[in-house]
A protein has these predicted regions:
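Second-shell loop/turn segments in exported
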Residues: 20-26, 53-61, 68, 89-92, ...
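Bacterial signal peptide processing site
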Residues: 14-15
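Glycine-rich short-loop/terminal segments
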Residues: 18-44
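Sec-dependent N-terminal signal peptides
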Residues: 3-11
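A cross-kingdom marker for long, charged
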Residues: 103-110, 116-118, 138-190
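Short N-proximal segments of mature Sec-exported proteins
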Residues: 34-82, 86-87
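Stable alpha-helical elements in mature extracytoplasmic
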Residues: 29, 33, 64-67, 97, ...
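A recognition module on extended beta-rich or small alphabeta surfaces enriched in W/G with H and D/E
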Residues: 96-126, 132
Length: 190
C-alpha cells in the first residue's frame, strides 16, 4: 500500500499542466486595441464636463468617447457603444459579467483587469474646490494628467503581452471567441 501511495505521489508531482497558447484571433484583436488606444492618446480629445475637465463617462455631451468606448467603437461595434450610453453612460465595465458587452470584452484580447485599468484613466477626484470655474491652466493640467495615465497604461499593456493573451485565452468559452450580438439590455450586471 505504501508503494502505491508513493507511486501516485510521484505521478502527481510529475504531471505538468499543458501550456496554453494564446488564441490567434485574440492576438490580432489585442494588437488592434493597442493601435486604437495609441491613436486615441495621440489625438488627445477626451470626454469632458461642461467646464472642460476630464469626465469618466462612455460618451460626453459632445459625443466624445472614453478610451474603452473608443476601442469598442473602432472594433466595429458602434451600436454597442450607443446601447451602453443609452442604458448607463457611467457603466463600469468591471461590473459587467454577462451579455453583449461582456462578450466583446472576452473577445477583445484584453484581460478584465486591463479593461478596468483603461476605463479608470479618467476617474479623477477633483474634490470640493473643483465645483467652481477653473482657469484654463488647471483644465489643461487635468487633460495632461489623463494623457499621462493613458501613456502609462499603454506601457503596461505592452509589457508581458504573452501572459495577458494567455489569461484572455483561458476565459474564452470553449476556446472560442464570442460573437457579439447587441441585445437589450446590453449591460448585464451581477
Amino acid at each position: 500500500m505504501k508503494h502505491l501511495l508513493l507511486i501516485a505521489l510521484f505521478a502527481a508531482c510529475g504531471h505538468q499542466p499543458q501550456a496554453v497558447e494564446p488564441h490567434p484571433e485574440l492576438t490580432t484583436r489585442r494588437a488592434q486595441m493597442l493601435g486604437y488606444l495609441a491613436e486615441y492618446t495621440e489625438r488627445g480629445v477626451f470626454p469632458t464636463d461642461e467646464r472642460g475637465l476630464p469626465l469618466s463617462v462612455f460618451e460626453d455631451a459632445h459625443g466624445v468617447r472614453c478610451p474603452m468606448a473608443e476601442l469598442i467603437y473602432r472594433s466595429g461595434h458602434p451600436e454597442l457603444v450607443a446601447a451602453i450610453v443609452a442604458e448607463d453612460n457611467h457603466a463600469r465595465l468591471g461590473d459587467i459579467h454577462d451579455g453583449p458587452v461582456h462578450d466583446w470584452m472576452v473577445g477583445s484580447g484584453l484581460t478584465h483587469d486591463e479593461i478596468v485599468m483603461i476605463q479608470g484613466i479618467a476617474d479623477i477626484n477633483y474634490g470640493p474646490l473643483f465645483k467652481i470655474e477653473q482657469p484654463a491652466n488647471v483644465i489643461t493640467a487635468q487633460r495632461e494628467r489623463v494623457r499621462g495615465r493613458l501613456e502609462t497604461a499603454q506601457a503596461a499593456l505592452r509589457k508581458d503581452q504573452r501572459d495577458s493573451l494567455t489569461a484572455a485565452t483561458l476565459v474564452l468559452p470553449q476556446h472560442r471567441v464570442p460573437v457579439v450580438k447587441v441585445t437589450r439590455p446590453a449591460i448585464a450586471k451581477h
